Regions:
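Terminal presequence/propeptide segments associated with secretion/organelle targeting
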Residues: 1-174
Length: 174
């Protein structure tokens, strides 16, 4: 996905689920406990760290700065990608199952604010914000144009083959 490393997506998921009203917090905590057990069952932080280093390195090598999230650009300029990722994994609560389970168990209505300072969440927020502001609008325009052109193509096909019966296909292109 756009985030690459599992910890980045996990940070966004936990934040979203803990950012609920006090009335819904206990239900969210129970759901998160089960999800955390599943997540950490076969999670390997060392592997995830290597993946994140390579992914961010590739961003910086292959994209122009206007296509790189701000957090990634700052990381590259300040410490370098490898040092940034090492710090992220050493300081993130979410890199360790025991710390995450403790965070969930002790969660209060304000716990999500603590996650806002977590380096994995900050990276996730930067990437998601960048995607929402820069990539999604362009992607939506392209998809709209593809839909419009598919309709023109189908109308032309039906006009060329008036005796043929056309059926909708599974992915809704017809």
């Amino acid at each position: 996905g756009k985030r690459g490393a599992e910890i980045v997506g996990w940070a966004a998921d936990i934040y979203k689920k803990l950012n609920v009203s006090a009335e819904k917090l206990e239900e969210a905590k129970e759901q998160l406990k089960a999800e955390a057990e599943e997540f950490y069952k076969d999670y390997d932080a060392a592997t995830d760290q290597k993946i994140l280093v390579e992914m961010l390195r590739l961003y910086n090598q292959n994209l122009t700065p206007d296509w790189i999230p701000e957090e990634v650009q700052l990381a590259n300029r300040k410490k370098g990608i490898e040092a940034y990722v090492q710090t992220l994994f050493s300081k993130s609560i979410l890199a360790d199952q025991e710390n995450t389970m403790k965070l969930i168990a002790q969660a209060t209505p304000d716990t999500y604010k603590k996650l806002e300072k977590d380096p994995a969440y900050r990276l996730s927020l930067s990437m998601n914000t960048f995607y929402a502001q820069n990539i999604f609008p362009e992607l939506a325009k392209i998809e709209k144009e593809i839909t419009r052109l598919n309709q023109i193509w189908l109308a032309g096909l039906m006009e060329m083959q008036p005796d043929k019966t056309f059926y909708a296909d599974a992915n809704s292109t017809l």
